[in-house]
Amino acid sequence: MYQEFFVNTAQNETSDNGIIFIYISLSVFSATIISYFIPQRFDLFYIYLLIWFGCFSIFFLIFKSKIIKSLYTIRTRIRKSTVWPTSMKIINGICWAAPFALGALIPSMHEYLILAGIGFGNISTFIIFLLNNKIKNIDQLIVGIICMISIGIIIFLYDGKVIEKSYGEFLARILISIAYGIGGIYSAIIKPE
């Protein structure tokens, strides 16, 4: 049973998120590390944009052919999601968007809400695809679970005075990068039977 759940069987489609997740992981990690060394001043905001755009662009060029190849599968999945019942679309949208919207309203909880948005969003998408389309995106489930666990990690580190609150967003981005990296590696390594 364990293997049947975590390895896609013949009746289920496989996930092709691996390269996309690895791309996201490397881009977020690189941009986060480089941004860390730039002084945090509002007048340098454009530099942050250049760093993030540059990191995503560089890794896109590195993985270009594989990303373009996997976009066909992703486009097919998006088409399948258009036939979901309206209630499921709303639930999925709320899972993705609500934490990010709250992050704008409650900046002091931004790092938790980023992780919650990615966690709830990936978990809800996994569940809905599994129920409606028989697609096992275990890599999405992995990303979601790691992001949710990461909220606890940050709380533990704050309470234990291991890190200061000012490093929370940096740590959240690193943990997001790790989550997508693990999900991407899982997807790239685990193949259907």
Regions found by a protein language model. Give the residues of each.
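C-terminal ends of transmembrane helices
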Residues: 60-79, 126-133, 184-193
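Membrane-proximal helix-loop-helix units in multi-pass membrane proteins
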Residues: 83-145
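Alpha-helical transmembrane segments and their membrane-interface exit regions
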Residues: 53-60, 116-128, 175-187
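Membrane-interfacial loop-to-transmembrane alpha-helix junctions, especially the N-terminal start
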Residues: 16-22, 46, 136-143
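Terminal transmembrane helical module of multi-pass membrane proteins
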Residues: 128-193
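Selected alpha-helical membrane-embedding segments in polytopic membrane proteins
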Residues: 22-105
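Membrane-helix interface and helix-disruption motif detector
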Residues: 36-51, 101-117, 156-172
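N-terminal juxtamembrane cytosolic/stromal segments of multi-pass membrane proteins
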Residues: 1-21
